[in-house]
Amino acid sequence: MAANVGSMFQYWKRFDLRRLQKELNSVASELSARQEESEHSHKHLIELRREFKKNVPEEIREMVAPVLKSFQAEVVALSKRSQEAEAAFLSVYKQLIEAPDPVPVFEAARSLDDRLQPPSFDPSGQPRRDLHTSWKRNPELLSPKEQREGTSPAGPTLTEGSRLPGIPGKALLTETLLQRNEAEKQKGLQEVQITLAARLGEAEEKIKVLHSALKATQAELLELRRKYDEEAASKADEVGLIMTNLEKANQRAEAAQREVESLREQLASVNSSIRLACCSPQGPSGDKVNFTLCSGPRLEAALASKDREILRLLKDVQHLQSSLQELEEASANQIADLERQLTAKSEAIEKLEEKLQAQSDYEEIKTELSILKAMKLASSTCSLPQGMAKPEDSLLIAKEAFFPTQKFLLEKPSLLASPEEDPSEDDSIKDSLGTEQSYPSPQQLPPPPGPEDPLSPSPGQPLLGPSLGPDGTRTFSLSPFPSLASGERLMMPPAAFKGEAGGLLVFPPAFYGAKPPTAPATPAPGPEPLGGPEPADGGGGGAAGPGAEEEQLDTAEIAFQVKEQLLKHNIGQRVFGHYVLGLSQGSVSEILARPKPWRKLTVKGKEPFIKMKQFLSDEQNVLALRTIQVRQRGSITPRIRTPETGSDDAIKSILEQAKKEIESQKGGEPKTSVAPLSIANGTTPASTSEDAIKSILEQARREMQAQQQALLEMEVAPRGRSVPPSPPERPSLATASQNGAPALVKQEEGSGGPAQAPLPVLSPAAFVQSIIRKVKSEIGDAGYFDHHWASDRGLLSRPYASVSPSLSSSSSSGYSGQPNGRAWPRGDEAPVPPEDEAAAGAEDEPPRTGELKAEGATAEAGARLPYYPAYVPRTLKPTVPPLTPEQYELYMYREVDTLELTRQVKEKLAKNGICQRIFGEKVLGLSQGSVSDMLSRPKPWSKLTQKGREPFIRMQLWLSDQLGQAVGQQPGASQASPTEPRSSPSPPPSPTEPEKSSQEPLSLSLESSKENQQPEGRSSSSLSGKMYSGSQAPGGIQEIVAMSPELDTYSITKRVKEVLTDNNLGQRLFGESILGLTQGSVSDLLSRPKPWHKLSLKGREPFVRMQLWLNDPHNVEKLRDMKKLEKKAYLKRRYGLISTGSDSESPATRSECPSPCLQPQDLSLLQIKKPRVVLAPEEKEALRKAYQLEPYPSQQTIELLSFQLNLKTNTVINWFHNYRSRMRREMLVEGTQDEPDLDPSGGPGILPPGHSHPDPTPQSPDSETEDQKPTVKELELQEGPEENSTPLTTQDKAQVRIKQEQMEEDAEEEAGSQPQDSGELDKGQGPPKEEHPDPPGNDGLPKVAPGPLLPGGSTPDCPSLHPQQESEAGERLHPDPLSFKSASESSRCSLEVSLNSPSAASSPGLMMSVSPVPSSSAPISPSPPGAPPAKVPSASPTADMAGALHPSAKVNPNLQRRHEKMANLNNIIYRVERAANREEALEWEF
């Protein structure tokens, strides 16, 4: 036993239980880790299996399934095995891990065993048993191993089995306890960690807060320190200041002390001297003392006198101030009064305009009827006897006799009233009256027998006119010519018809039903007629009178009735719209289909219904319209007419008219067989020059007649029509109206008829040149007088009149035959419809050219159209030549890809910078809207009608350049041709030349360049002409823009700004001269440039220009030069060194302007100053010499001169223009001075020798007389007024004075106001800015008259047509010389304007026109007021001044006669030259 125990003890001693337990622990942890891993992998495996099932197709799954299943079984088996092994291990582990070490127990057991060993006797059994029991009692002493093995340390093996079961339970219990403890420990640790983390976070936040607080406090500290430093510094400064102040104060105090001491000393010395003086006897020193004593009183006296003087001066100052205030107040009051008057008058004008607008339709109906009658009469009386119906003639004469007073009534107010009133109004009247029969004064018109005799006024009536003078102004606001409105309207139409067919057509009473009552009343009463008839007449609105407008019309009913009538008579809406409403077919259709109720209509909207009502009121109207319709359908002629016939006709008509005008002036000499009209005028017979001219014109007329018999019918009647005005009160009315109206009339007549009988081909250019030579030689220098109105008239008559013969015809048919085209006074007629009609006429009626033959006068009517200058003409509906049948066939039935076609067209348009409007007008014959629509949304070819396909066919033809309209050629054609030929006075190319011009290639390109507003034309081209030629021609710049690579707009603008600021150049100057933009636009561009890709073609242009400018090495110098020139020009203007007119500061001056006429849009941009071209003295000398040799230089001469003098050709041309006109003015002035001496009694024709018959020294064929001009001028310059003044009356002296002034101005002007190329207007002229651009669509029209047709213009300067002289005497009364000069200046400006117009270039005669509009009207009228009134004083300035005081003052009739003649001839020549000039072919084409 002992051995047993010992061996056990040894065994357990060797056995390291603790190490074993540790190893078991580590293995257990490994196992648990592995178990987790295996769980994860198991899960992963399951997921993979699912994915595999999802993703793998079934076939594969079936193939792989057995492998997978076996694999799965393996895995499952493995996992089971490992779990079992783990479980076994764990069970062992659980038993061993907590087992106590048995070694100590064994040791104790052994020791006991040893103690018990010796007694080997039996009784030992008892203690053993006890021990056994003690073991039993303390089973926990047994080691688990023993328990497991069933051994007990001492007891017998029997008991072991019973002890074993309790041991594993205890082990489990201890294990769970241990686990719990660990878990609790871990929890504790986690909680500790969490709390630590939380605390740490809080601590960090606190640290951050502290950091930010620290920073804030640091910043505050710094701020405080800074403030402290500042305060310290300021305190230091203050202290320093205080110290310096103290020092200064100390110094002052010391100085004061010193002064005080010195004063004390002086006082003491004075006192002592006084004492001495008192005490001591007068000795030699006494005088001195006296002196010192006296000096005091003397000083006081001096001071007192000074005080008195100061007081006196103060009083003077106060007095002056009060007088100044009074003056200011007075002037302010005057200004206010004038403003009030102005507003009153403008209101009156507005009212009148409204009335006119409201009442236009009546006239139109009248015209239709007149046409009808004319046609009937024409057909019935082919022989056209001139004195056809005596009673009618007598009626006419009665009317004529009646009209002078009327006319004077009408005129006076317009002359006296302020120039604001719409001059077009009295023009029109004058035209209507004066042109037809320049009514002889009643005294001279013996009232012929006839039923209407009562109408002819008694001889006393003419006095009415003058007596009216003073009231005129007052009553003006009512209506400038109401009396006329009623009376004349009543009477003129019949008169009008007389021209039409040679006899009178008095309309049926129904037509004039409303009028007769008012008529008789008109002539008799004095001033009342001005206001009187108007109420009765309603200002003339149609037969219905004013009531018609006020009453509520049933629009639906009217529309219904109109439709009914149109259907019944088979009249088309287009014709109805054109002739009756002045509207397009679309508008008519809209109005008739959906008439709005009356109350919802605007004033303008009511007009068509009023017109329709008036149209319906008389069956005659409907019949007339039907006739027109029938005739229209009957004759469809091509719209484009050969230039030949056009210009020939024009020439013919001009000459015809000229003849007529001369007759009218010679009034006394009966011209035709119409006896009643040829009543002697009471004036002396015309001079020989007049006869000569007359004979030339007669001869021309005969030649023309030989060429075209057909025109005879038309010529007979109109020729006898005019009787000259004799009353001196209206001297110039005659010219204005006669010249203007008949001119137009005749011209229209000419152009109206031609289509039907084409002239035999004769080169018009040659023919006209010869006539011009003759006329010029006859006219002498005096003949170029009235360019202005000539030009205006020309322009007026042209835009429609000559723009297309077809138009003329159409318009003529539209405007009955009042010979002057306006039998109705302007007063009761709205300007709009007529213009519309004109436009429409142009559009619609070209076909009717043929039929008009019968109505010569009808045609004239058309000519008159343009007299509604205040109205901006609608652009003509584009008319394009019809497609030829071949072209139709070629394309009509061939499939076309419209999308591709429109794309190509758009590309070509963009590339060539052609705008859609031009393209539409010139190529497709469509409006811009239609073109835009067609290009953006082309319909497929299959869906297009035949008409719808036409535009696409045209596009194809255009793309393949088979269409005449050379839209694309802009740059070449537009630049070259218009400028050169037009401006050169050399004979124009013969009309037979390029026929293609008839297709308006040129106009097209011109317009397109206009359209795109090539600013560079005006802008970049240098002002001085030479200066800035960098810019491209309009087409050019656009191509550059189209081709230009992407530019960095930002950097460009940045550079431009830098260059401008570095060189102190203003944005305005830069914008105007380089970009052609206003200062605002430039500022906007430079401050906010858009990126290149967002800009349109147009928007890119300024940037391309900037880039070009930046690349130009001389850009800054050029701008500086411009700036200097501007300054110079400004100073000259400012200090009166130069006449306003001559500053070429207007668009015109851009000599380099590539496109000959600026676009209307440009003009608005271009209202900027531009430096004049200043010529050096030697250049002027050279030019003068050249002038002596050739006043009308040929193109070669011009080019040679420009090359030699290094000037631009434009400059040379303009210099010649200016110089010629200057010479003419001087001749005129001389003439006016001489005239009183030569012909005090006043034969109209006796011209001072040398004026009308200059000695025929050899000269250039064009102007045989011009050569004398220089000599005249030199004489005048040398001798000056002295020579003249001796024989002169005071009047004449005044004129001389003016003349000198002119000469100075001229010298200035010569120095360089070469208007460059397109209309020059001075800044001073306000509105006239719009001058040159022709209204769109009238490209080829004369561009001479700057304003009249322009959009803005409320009135053309032609208004000044007011009787020329009268207006000068009465209206332009500038009581002070200054204003007088200003008048001359402003008018001069207009003179120059016309100079530069291309047409002017070709017709030198123009240059001189003088329509004396008062300068006062300058600001108001849209175009320069007139040509130089001051230069050609009608009477003398003094007379003018007197006129100011006596409105009815009269002008010397002889003078007037002479002026009228000159104006006439001037006008004739101008128009003849225009007609001959092939460049103007466009006028006749459309």
From Swiss-Prot:
Residues 461-470, 802-816, 1017-1031, 1402-1420 have a biased composition (Low complexity). It is found in: Nucleus. Its main location: nucleus. Residues 195-374, 690-717 form a coiled coil. The modification Phosphoserine is found at residue 143. SMART domains: CUT, HOX. InterPro entries: CUT_dom, HD, Homeobox_CS, Homeodomain-like_sf, Lambda_DNA-bd_dom_sf. Gene3D superfamilies: Homeodomain-like (1.10.10.60), lambda repressor-like DNA-binding domains (1.10.260.40). Residues 114-167, 415-481, 517-549, 661-690, 716-758, 800-858, 964-1032, 1231-1453 are annotated as: Disordered. Residues 127-149, 845-854, 1266-1276, 1320-1334 have a biased composition (Basic and acidic residues). The keyword Nucleus applies. GO terms for cellular component: chromatin; extracellular exosome; nucleus. Belongs to the CUT homeobox family. This is Homeobox protein cut-like 2. The gene is CUX2.
